[in-house]
């Protein structure tokens, strides 16, 4: 069995990597990937904690996090396609430009 500290450290490293990708990248696709990494790292922390204490709550939260990630990915990819159709660009800075 993997120790609790190792699993939580891995989840924290993945969360920091996802947050870094979310903050530093200006491409919407990479921002969505970073957000997915963050959601999966939180789900990993739930599973590791649940297996350490012998509870099934961590696995239930994992199922909830995966369904949340699927909904977020479908909405995000739909927005990504619309942005690419209208701007021919996935740069998030083009969205904040005002028309006129």
From Swiss-Prot:
EC code: 7.1.1.-
Cellular component GO terms, alphabetical: NADH dehydrogenase complex; plasma membrane
Catalyzed reaction equations: a quinone + NADH + 5 H(+)(in) = a quinol + NAD(+) + 4 H(+)(out)
One of the GO BP terms on file: ATP synthesis coupled electron transport
Keywords: Cell inner membrane, Cell membrane, Membrane, NAD, Quinone, Translocase, Transmembrane, Transmembrane helix, Transport, Ubiquinone
Top EC class, one word: translocase
Entry-linked InterPro entries: NADH_UbQ_OxRdtase_chain4L/K, NUOK/Mnh_C1-like
SS bond list: none
Entry's transmembrane regions: 4-24, 28-48, 60-80
Location in or out of the cell: Cell inner membrane
Predominant subcellular localization, coarse grouping: membrane
Domain of life of the source: Bacteria
Membrane topology according to the record: Multi-pass membrane protein
MF annotations from Gene Ontology: NADH:ubiquinone reductase (non-electrogenic) activity; quinone binding
Subunit structure: NDH-1 is composed of 13 different subunits. Subunits NuoA, H, J, K, L, M, N constitute the membrane sector of the complex.
Role played: NDH-1 shuttles electrons from NADH, via FMN and iron-sulfur (Fe-S) centers, to quinones in the respiratory chain. The immediate electron acceptor for the enzyme in this species is believed to be ubiquinone. Couples the redox reaction to proton translocation (for every two electrons transferred, four hydrogen ions are translocated across the cytoplasmic membrane), and thus conserves the redox energy in a proton gradient.
Similarity comment text for this entry: Belongs to the complex I subunit 4L family.
Name recorded for this polypeptide: NADH-quinone oxidoreductase subunit K
UniProt source species: Proteus mirabilis (strain HI4320)
């Amino acid at each position: 069995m993997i120790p609790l500290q190792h699993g939580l450290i891995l989840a924290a490293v993945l969360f920091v990597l996802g947050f870094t990708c979310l903050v530093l990248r200006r491409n919407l696709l990479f921002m969505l990937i970073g957000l997915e990494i963050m959601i999966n790292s939180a789900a990993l922390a739930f599973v590791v904690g649940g297996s350490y204490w012998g509870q099934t709550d961590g696995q239930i939260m994992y199922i909830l996090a995966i369904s949340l990630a699927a909904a977020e990915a479908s909405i995000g990819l739909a927005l990504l396609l619309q942005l690419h159709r209208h701007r021919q660009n996935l740069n998030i800075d083009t969205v904040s430009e005002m028309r006129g």
